[in-house]
């Protein structure tokens, strides 16, 4: 009798245990399904963000190359000035939308800050980022896309009554989906979450981020089936192993030194310029004057400088002096743009700086007879990755992102 009683207890406990396991599996399955939904929504928001940036860049380039009368330039200048003042006022009211957004996303994921008004801040980040870059500032799209994704992940977790312990995983999934939507790169989006936001490789976080990234990347690939980076010819220098080792060691050391200087001077400007006792209209006037002057001379260098880099990669100049001047102008412009606190990331400007450094280094090697002109674009691509790794310190993300953007695996 006692044996039968113990058997019944064991059976009940076993059934309860199985049900608990199945319940956990159902919860995980629900989380994965919701992460797919987060990726879809992030793609539907971040991809139009990307499209609007390209659209306004084309509008701005058409205007500056059409040689309109001077009074049209005066009118446009005052319109852009008003836009920058409006965006700066948004940042003053909602400080979390300032800058790129990756530090804020990391802080929200780690519980150091809380998104109190995620929907309002999402709209403000979207509009502020588009308007700031439409004025030509040297900012990127990846940081805002990451933060937009984190806002969407937060909103879905609240609206969907997701368990409190799983909300940060949806926030991280949304952040990864944002990067995937910005560059159509789902693998690098997962790596970014692990290397920069989450900083540990929890399997559930990796799975949710990858699912959201694949869906968001699919939306981006549907909207932008090709990327301009695959048009850059990457011809590997035909050097011996020893000579290649010497070449890349020298290049790596040079990039590390410049990246260290870059990493020190950017925070210095970001601290000093906001501390200047100037009103917002005056600060925006100075910033817009620089942006407008560059737009009048070299429009491709504005808006982050990605178009200028593409032009150099496909049909670049051989004039080292001119290219060095353009790189320094872009660098100084980026410092002032990042120090403004307006919505926009540093990813694209950093890539452009690294790419131009790689091109200059390649042209120097051509003059010394180490490589040919056909290898300069390859050095540009290597420079982009090397400088990004040295500045951001996310090596896997940088390498995989470059490969995904060029749609090749051999790199």
For each predicted feature, which ranges?
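Alpha-helical transmembrane segments and immediately membrane-proximal extracytoplasmic
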Residues: 1-411
